[in-house]
């Protein structure tokens, strides 16, 4: 059997640049991200050549649109095609940001919807009871009972006095 690897580019001396290396690092990174690497080769070449997943791209777009452009893209000149692509990406990212915000601030399903047109504009949300509010409620009940007892006693005295 001969050499396992018959590719002349891979047999070049170590340390010398391969024949396809003729650009700066930014262009090289852009070229690598555009080329698809077969799944079998990914295991041999390592994680740096693996394609980013859709989820990681989406998360990067969300971060970029919600927190402003990344420093790597800010110094880069954008062509008209790039701007169109970026506009679409920003629109979808803004949509996801807005949907996340609306999901987190949506009114609770048990909120009372009033039929009064003046109140309908502002939905009322019920606050969750805390131990402190329970205590306040109990104290209020006790005060009502005390007042009621006093009233009864006074009425009883008045009845007895009249007799």
UniProtKB/Swiss-Prot annotation:
Name this protein carries in UniProt: Coiled-coil domain-containing protein 140
UniProt keyword annotation of 4Fe-4S present: no
Taxonomic classification: Eukaryota, Metazoa, Chordata, Craniata, Vertebrata
Biased composition (Basic residues): 54-63, 146-163
Cysteine disulfide partners in this protein: none
Stretches with biased composition (Low complexity): 115-131
Coiled coil regions in record: 134-163
Organism: Homo sapiens
Biased composition (Basic and acidic residues): 135-145
Keywords carried by this UniProt record: Coiled coil
UniProt feature, compositional bias: Polar residues: 26-36, 100-114
The gene coding this protein: CCDC140
Region of interest: Disordered: 1-79, 100-163
């Amino acid at each position: 059997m001969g050499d396992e690897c018959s590719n002349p580019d891979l047999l070049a001396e170590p340390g010398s640049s391969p024949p396809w290396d003729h650009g700066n690092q930014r262009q090289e990174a852009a070229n690598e991200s555009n080329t698809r690497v077969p799944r079998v080769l990914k295991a041999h070449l390592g994680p740096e050549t693996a394609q980013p997943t859709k989820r990681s791209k989406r998360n990067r777009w969300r971060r970029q649109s919600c927190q402003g452009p990344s420093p790597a893209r800010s110094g880069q000149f954008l062509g008209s095609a790039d701007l169109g692509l970026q506009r679409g990406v920003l629109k979808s990212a803004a949509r996801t940001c807005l949907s996340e915000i609306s999901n987190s601030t949506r009114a609770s399903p048990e909120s009372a919807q009033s039929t009064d047109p003046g109140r309908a504009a502002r939905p009322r949300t019920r606050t969750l009871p805390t131990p402190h509010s329970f205590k306040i409620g109990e104290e209020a009940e006790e005060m009502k009972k005390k007042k009621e007892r006093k009233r009864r006693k006074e009425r009883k005295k008045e009845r007895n006095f009249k007799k």
